[in-house]
Curated annotation (Swiss-Prot):
Zn(2+) 2 binds at C236, C239, C257, H262. This is Ubiquitin carboxyl-terminal hydrolase 51. It comes from Homo sapiens (Human). It comes from the Eukaryota. InterPro entries: Papain-like_cys_pep_sf, Peptidase_C19_UCH, Ub_carboxyl-term_hydrolase, USP_CS, USP_dom, Znf_RING/FYVE/PHD, Znf_UBP. The gene is USP51. GO terms for molecular function: chromatin binding; cysteine-type deubiquitinase activity; histone binding; histone H2A deubiquitinase activity; zinc ion binding. Zn(2+) 1 binds at C195, H197, C285, C288.
Length: 711
């Protein structure tokens, strides 16, 4: 009789499975048949359990008889029944290989249950002996945990000695995480050998020595000398900071920020793939984009750290720290300072730090390449009170189609930057760029003249400030009310007197500065002594005493005989006659700039005049006015337009030139407050004394009217 199997189907499907190959039967026959089926099923179960228990003891393994085939029929709700082909029962036979690590589990046989028809009560099945309990299955083998990559440094022993490969998929099996490779490594001791870039680095020469030096000097710095060296040297070569996770390149001398990606840019540019973290000593691979572990590198770091700790705890101080740093770890007896001396490093020093000389508006300027001539002029301009008030109050109205090319707008930004309160030096690259655009003769990184730059920047500012004059220049071209003309423009009167009829021809020209000849120049010394025209003129030439600024002004305003070779046509006598010329100041500017002419050309030779010129802190310009000259001609009467103290000036800036014509440097002295002077050398600003100021050589002198000054 065929074995009965029951397969559960979804409810409501209308299909039921019946074992055997017959059709319908009477109820009595069905009950009798069900009882026999129960007895057969119980016997088959008992025999099967006994046979499987015997098979487990057999050596070698024997084959199990195949299970009998059965024909299954299905019947639908319509009463049609069809016979399905017999399907062998799938089970683990003895012919299939069994895993040698575990014993085969006994497969329980399906129990036959009687399916009674509705309305019939089946008799209870006869009692059967319970089958013996199957042996307990062995516990499942522990499944190895997949290793998750970590950005921390691996410790020896806590993880496999070799990490996953850089690419992650060794055999191209589609396992980018490298889990299969790692399982091979754990089970059979195979798998990846670590970062290939580290292996390539280890092929090079002296890599161990260089790595030890990096760990010794910049990572495990335990002595005061190494800490000082690390504080001075370990700064980013791009942003000059040491707070953004510094890394050191293992292929060259370069420190870069990891947070700001400066070390990444270096690695990409130089193709240097490895760097060491200077705080933890771990190695980062830029190709793998992860921290990598290497047994040899880890051993070097461990030995270096233990060496330094052993030297720190040693009590011997016979060997100096310098020997330790240069020994290369070959001298095992080298020691350094004891740990007991370290608390002395944190004790306050007896000497106090110098008080900062910082004041608002006093800010250094970066030299962009032979731009010291520009920096000193900018320092002088930014300390003019009226000019400062104009730019800080944003009174400029730009009418240019491209405001980025307006020099007045850039000067406004420069004033705001100088008076922003920042102590870091300012970089005036935009100002330099605009000067190159609007004054092409100053373009380039050649050495330039500070006086020439002053005239150029005033001219460009004047042209870009025409709209600020309120339209007065459109009505009168000779009258401009821009901020540059209000501050710097003065009136220079030239009187030419005919020697025949004594008629005077007067001309008044605007001027932004006054250029003064010096004793020792070609304009002042005797032309009959050509041997005096050497490359350098001493301070004692021509004048027995020390010449002063007042002497130069008197020479500038003296009557000058033009001679027979420079005859001019007189408007009165209508003939060419010899004449005399005298220059005086018709109008005094608010800021008077005096240019001492220290550079001159003698034929094909250029030279610098080093004659010392003394200059006062306060200057009275009354003797050099045109009204003073007229009053002298009227028998000593006081000037008609002279007001007491109106013509007095105070010195507030001095620009000096150091060196020769071919190679020189410009610096400046700036008065920040009354009697407080500072020396400005590009980005370096130091406090200066009045003696330092007055004993300087002087090239450009800036004076401000006392009545309009603001201390």
């Amino acid at each position: 009789m065929a074995q009965v199997r029951e397969t559960s189907l979804p409810s409501g499907s209308g299909v039921r499975w019946i074992s055997g190959g017959g059709g319908g039967a009477s109820p009595e026959e069905a009950v009798e048949k069900a009882g026999k089926m129960e007895e057969a099923a119980a016997g088959a179960t008992k025999a099967s359990s006994r046979r499987e228990a015997e098979e487990m003891k057999l050596e070698p393994l024997q084959e199990r008889e195949p299970a009998p085939e059965e024909n299954l029929t299905w019947s639908s709700s319509g009463g049609d029944e069809k016979v399905l082909p017999s399907i062998p029962l799938r089970c683990h036979s003895s012919s299939s290989p069994v895993c040698p690590r575990r014993k085969p589990r006994p497969r329980p046989q399906p129990r036959a249950r009687s399916r009674s028809q509705p309305g019939l009560s089946a008799p209870p099945p006869p009692p059967a002996r319970p089958p013996p309990p199957p042996p307990p299955p062995p516990p499942p083998a522990p499944r190895p945990r997949a290793w998750r990559g970590s950005r921390r440094r691996s410790r020896p022993g806590s993880r496999p000695q070799t990490r996953r490969s850089c690419s992650g998929d060794l055999d191209g099996s589609g396992d980018p995480g490298g889990l299969g490779d790692w399982l091979l490594e754990v089970e059979f001791g195979q798998g990846p050998t670590g970062c290939s870039h580290v292996e390539s680095f280890k092929v090079g020469k002296n890599w161990q020595k260089n790595l030890r030096l990096i760990y010794q000097r910049f990572v495990w710095s335990g002595t005061p000398e190494t800490r000082k060296r690390k504080a001075k040297s370990c700064i980013c070569h791009v942003c000059s900071t040491h707070m953004n996770r510094l890394h050191s390149c293992l292929s060259c001398v370069f420190f870069g920020c990891f947070t700001e990606k400066h070390i990444h840019k270096h690695a990409e540019t130089k193709q240097h793939h490895l760097a060491v973290d200077l705080y933890h000593g771990v190695i980062y691979c830029f190709m793998c984009k992860d921290y990598v572990y290497d047994k040899d590198i880890e051993q070097i770091a461990k030995e270096t750290k233990e060496k330094i700790l052993r030297l720190l705890t040693s009590t011997s101080t016979d060997v100096s720290h310098q020997q330790f740093m240069t020994s290369g770890f070959e001298d095992k007896q080298s020691t350094c300072e004891t740990k007991e001396q370290e608390p002395k490093l944190v004790k306050p020093k007896k000497k106090r730090r110098k008080k900062s000389v910082y004041t608002v508006g006093l800010r250094g300027l970066i030299n962009l390449g032979n731009t010291c001539f520009m920096n000193c002029i900018v320092q002088a301009l930014t300390h003019i009170p009226l000019l400062k008030d104009f730019f800080l109050s944003d009174k400029h109205k730009c009418i240019m189609t491209s405001p980025s090319l307006c020099l007045v707008c850039e000067m406004s930004s420069l004033f705001h930057a100088m008076y922003s309160g920042s102590r870091t030096p300012h970089i005036p690259y935009k100002l330099l760029h605009l000067i190159w655009i609007h004054a092409e003769h100053l373009a380039g990184y050649r050495q330039q003249d500070a006086h020439e730059f002053l005239i150029a920047i005033l001219d460009v500012l004047h042209r870009h400030s025409k709209d600020d004059s309120g339209g007065q220049e459109a009505n009168n071209p000779n009258c401009c009310n821009c901020i540059i003309d209000q501050i710097f423009t003065g009136g220079l009167q030239s009187d030419v007197t005919c020697q025949a009829c004594h008629s005077v021809s007067t001309t008044i020209d605007p001027c932004w500065d006054i250029s003064l000849d010096l004793p020792g120049s070609c304009a002042t010394f005797d032309s009959q002594n050509p041997e005096r025209a050497d490359s350098t003129v001493s301070r004692d030439d021509h004048i027995p005493g020390i010449p002063s600024l007042t002497d130069c002004l008197q020479w500038f305003t003296r009557p000058e005989h033009l001679g027979s070779s420079a005859k001019i046509k007189c408007n009165s006598c209508q003939s060419y006659q010899e004449s005399t010329k005298q220059l005086t100041m018709k109008k005094l500017p608010i800021v008077a700039c005096f240019h001492l002419k220290r550079f001159e050309h003698v034929g094909k030779q250029r030279r610098k005049i080093n004659t010392f010129i003394s200059f006062p802190l306060e200057l009275d310009m009354t003797p050099f006015l045109a009204s003073t000259k007229e009053s002298r001609m009227k028998e000593g009467q006081p000037p008609t337009d002279c007001v007491p103290n109106e013509n007095k000036y105070s010195l507030f800036a001095v620009i000096n030139h150091h060196g020769t014509l071919e190679s020189g440097h410009y610096t400046s002295f700036i008065r920040q407050q009354k009697d407080q002077w500072f020396s400005c050398d590009d980005a370096i600003i130091t406090k200066a004394t009045i003696e330092d100021l007055l004993y300087s050589e002087g090239y450009l002198l800036f004076y401000h009217k006392q009545g309009l000054e603001k201390d």
